[in-house]
């Protein structure tokens, strides 16, 4: 029997509640499909500050590095807003990404038929949307040097540097090509090559890699047009590949096609070692401990972990089908509630998901 070590990071706010739901479901599908998940919980974020004084204890990072996958719930609490920026809960996540050398962020966006009315776009525009945004996570303008603010000639100037090396583009492009090959063999690389030298390099490297993935249809799109096309005709996209800045913006735009951030999972991957899987939503401290949280993004993040991190696609399919079935039956948490549906709390939603398995 295959065995996998999974580090659970419940974190802050609603994190412990949604982690409990995901863990129950993971145990069921693991038993059904003949593998074993060995869970280890570790503190991160505000809970780690309370326990150790640090947002990312060394013991947490060590445990994550030796795991097969890491499943994170949520980080953040206004209780710590008065701390120096480097001591706040959110720096725990940044440190974890750095410590695991994660460079590829994956954001799937799929329209669930039962929730199609939740989108702000017309049904005929978003029906059938199923795309993946692949964002480079560690380079580009957020990390480029030099950067800063200076005063010269009586004027203040701020500056940042947008830079990518060929090797940085190659490794993220490889991830995107492989994902496209596992999906529908369509890859759209998004850049600003009509203006930026760094984007011209990006486009050249993507084109250079394309012959190695001959079955994948490659196209290019300027980022301003891509932002428009995501709203005008999102069905045209399968896999979107882009850099850190453009991906930061486009992934949030794509997320809102669904109408609820409470349904969106994500993954961050490196070249080696475990991936990090987490919901897109935050810690929602205003509803923490009240049994109001929506656990579905956490469950779908667990499904991504099974599919991508542990190569257990059949078990992942079970979790995704359970989510679809529960929603089709009219069960909703408060963030998804609409007329004629049945309201449920976090625990009760978990019970319905278990029944749907």
Swiss-Prot record:
Kindly list the GO molecular function terms attached to this UniProt entry.
Answer: 3-isopropylmalate dehydrogenase activity; magnesium ion binding; NAD binding
SUPFAM superfamilies the UniProt entry points to: Isocitrate/Isopropylmalate dehydrogenase-like (SSF53659)
The record ties this protein, via InterPro entries, to: IsoCit/isopropylmalate_DH_CS (IPR019818), IsoPropMal-DH-like_dom (IPR024084), Isopropylmalate_DH (IPR004429)
Please list the disulfide bridges: none
The reaction(s) this protein catalyses:
(2R,3S)-3-isopropylmalate + NAD(+) = 4-methyl-2-oxopentanoate + CO2 + NADH
Q: Does the keyword Magnesium apply?
A: yes
Return one Gene Ontology term, BP aspect: L-leucine biosynthetic process
Name recorded for this polypeptide:
3-isopropylmalate dehydrogenase
Organism, by scientific name, is Synechococcus sp. (strain CC9902)
The coding gene here is: leuB
